[in-house]
């Protein structure tokens, strides 16, 4: 479908949403709008739940476009009682963590693997269980990965910590700040995964709104691609922007960027975790 956008001052532009019909867009809007200002519902949960729903309604659409062009613009239009742009900045990162957990845990449970989104004090507790709290800043991991019958510091259910996820809606979120923590985690034999929606577009009048991301290509890599392919600063990177170019079969570091939908089935991310934690 074609989504028309009004930027004010007479500046109007449009963006094409592949594999999204007008009926599907309306279905997503009808679900999300009542959640945006729902009392006692955290914005991170509203956005996370709506993203999972949107990817179910439009399984062949680009997940990053659904986030960037559909949910973000609905939220900015509908949010009241606060600056909507600042509210989105504050909460959207945690919303992505919520969505990762909600989407993948039903699939990973079959393999004895569990994800837990970490908020506030939970981050420090997770790093303590990993044995790296004294060397890693308390905000440098977003989602904990656990394996039943393995890992460090098993809980009462037998789930031990085997790694963590650095979740980034956009790679403009100073991903380089996570690299020291990631290297420490990997040095301890823990997985340190970068998961991203790789959101990046440029608005008019100079941009065309196409959400191309920031990872470049294997032949023309950006600095951020080199964090993974060149320097091996993360165990792996998973992008949910279908315009992201995946890594070639061989990279200088042996680490790879994978590109995936968000359908809730076995995919590159689940296959990777199962293989690594077998």
From Swiss-Prot:
CDD domains to which the protein is assigned, alphabetical: AgeI-like (cd22309)
GO biological process, one term: DNA restriction-modification system
Any one GO MF annotation of this record: type II site-specific deoxyribonuclease activity
Broadest EC class assigned to this enzyme: hydrolase
The keyword Nuclease is assigned to this record: yes
Keyword field: Endonuclease, Hydrolase, Nuclease, Restriction system
Reaction it catalyzes: Endonucleolytic cleavage of DNA to give specific double-stranded fragments with terminal 5'-phosphates
Listed EC numbers: 3.1.21.4
InterPro entries (alphabetical): RE_BsaWI
UniProt similarity note: Belongs to the BsaWI type II restriction endonuclease family.
Protein name (record): Type II restriction enzyme AgeI
